[in-house]
Amino acid sequence: MSNKRETFQSALWRGDFGNDYIGRNPASAANVQAAAMLWAQILLRMKGAPPRSILEVGANVGINLVALRALSGAELFAVEPNDQARRGLAEASIVPQANLLDGVASSIRLADRSIDLVFTRGVLIHIHPDDLLASCREMHRVAKRYIVSIEYFSANAEELTYRNQANALFKRDFGAFWLDNFPDLRVLDYGFAWQRLTGLDNLTWWAFEKSG
């Protein structure tokens, strides 16, 4: 298990920058429904062995977890660095208090292979490239069977200004990054959520299964 290390990016999300994000992205019925439609597609790829435990790394206010609670009987876990977001998750009883962890992707206080499905949505894009491998290693360590990443895609690694903030958004082919660094992963499927039809922000998703 990695030692907790604050980075420029994690400090952003713990502070006002992260609080502002919460205000822009509530767990509204429309947002939850859009997430549920996407997750219904992804979970279909796991129907032969559905996950009994699910961890979201960077859960924020729990849009995905609310959707997953309606779709799955799995026990839910969340890692989230922002205090305000964690309070919201606790007050709404989206995950049990014991399963709600203060942390970041590079430091997950859970045992090896303890969670069937570990995922991110719009989180890897906010991790500096120098810290990305350590973060993915932690997710891989904790995942027992499945890893899912739902992120912005770019064929080439690039940094973009995000909400007038430099050093906060990094796009790449995250699917290739997973496969290049973790040879025990196999692709279950991948897809694209087109904003025009789904209401989601042109997201690419990859679903992997561990072979070991």
Model-derived features with residue positions:
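A conserved beta-strand element that flanks and buttresses the S-adenosyl-L-methionine
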Residues: 119
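Nucleotide-sugar donor-binding/catalytic module of glycosyltransferases
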Residues: 122
